[in-house]
Amino acid sequence: MIAVYPGSFDPITLGHLDVIERGCKLFETVVVAVSKNPNKIPLFTVEQRIQQIRTCTLHLANVEIDAFHGLTVSYAKMRQAQVLLRGLRAVSDFEYELQMAHTNKSLYPQIETVFLTTANEYSFLSSSQVKEIARFGGSVAHLVPANVAIDLEKCFAQTPTVSTPIAQD
C-alpha cells in the first residue's frame, strides 16, 4: 500500500520525521511529497527541502521523496496511492484535516486519509515556530534533524540575534 505524506516541510521538523518513521512501519511505501505552494514564500527552495528530507530519511528503505504542485489528491491519484498520511498535533488540526479528508474523498473516492497523532514531545512543534526561533538565534537542535539545524544556522547567520526595543519618535 502506498501512502503520500504531503507538506511544505519548510523546514522538516522532528515531528514530521516522527510521522514518516511511523508511517514506514504501516505502509509498503511512504512518498514524502513536498508541495510547491504559490501562496507561501518558502525559506528553502524545493530542491533544498528535498535534499534535507533525503538526508534525514536515509535509514528508511521504503521512503520516496518527490515534489508536486496542484491538488494533493490529484498527485496521490497520479502516484496510485491509496492513502494520504497526515500528522495531528491538536484538536484544532483535526478540525481542518477532517474537512480536507472529506473534500479529498469527494474528489477521489478511492483515497483514504490516515491520521497519526504526533508524539507528545512534538505536539507544539511547527515549521513556522522553528524558523522564528532560528531567525533570532535560538537553538533548534532539539526540534529539527541535525542537517536542517545546520542549514537554518547558515541561513540566519547574518541576522541580529539580540532583541532590542524599537525607538519611537
Swiss-Prot record:
InterPro entries attached to this UniProt entry: Cyt_trans-like, PPAT, Rossmann-like_a/b/a_fold
EC category name: transferase
Pathway listed: Cofactor biosynthesis; coenzyme A biosynthesis; CoA from (R)-pantothenate: step 4/5
Highest taxon, organism lineage: Bacteria
EC number(s) recorded for this UniProt protein: 2.7.7.3
Pfam short name (any one): CTP_transf_like
Annotated site residue numbers, Transition state stabilizer: 16
Catalytic activity field: (R)-4'-phosphopantetheine + ATP + H(+) = 3'-dephospho-CoA + diphosphate
The name this protein goes by in its record: Phosphopantetheine adenylyltransferase
